[in-house]
């Protein structure tokens, strides 16, 4: 454990940020999973609605640096391709 006051403060802040980021990361994964599940059930309308809900969440977290912008782009590209393949 840290001995210096500022190091102790940073340790507390780091833990707080870690928990906050874990929550946000989980939220992103949940939204992506909802789109995947809609694709698996072959429900195009539900998949499009889930994608519309997921897209701003993923973009917002990418802009804040929680996930890399290329990863956000990859999520969106892969999912919209899968949705467009549905008939």
Swiss-Prot record:
Single GO term (MF): structural constituent of ribosome
Q: Where is this region: Disordered?
A: 1-25
Query: According to the lineage, what is the superkingdom?
Result: Bacteria
| The keyword rRNA-binding appears for this protein | yes
Q: Which Pfam families match?
A: Ribosomal_S20p
The UniProt record lists the keyword Ribosomal protein? yes
- Tell me the keywords, alphabetical order: Ribonucleoprotein, Ribosomal protein, RNA-binding, rRNA-binding
Q: What would be one Gene Ontology cellular-component term for the protein? A: cytosol
An example GO biological process term is:
translation
**Which HAMAP family does the record match to this protein?**
Ribosomal_bS20
Question: PANTHER family in the record, alphabetically?
Answer: 30S RIBOSOMAL PROTEIN S20, SMALL RIBOSOMAL SUBUNIT PROTEIN BS20C
- The family this protein is said to belong to: Belongs to the bacterial ribosomal protein bS20 family.
* Purpose: Binds directly to 16S ribosomal RNA.
Q: Spell out the protein name for this chain.
A: Small ribosomal subunit protein bS20
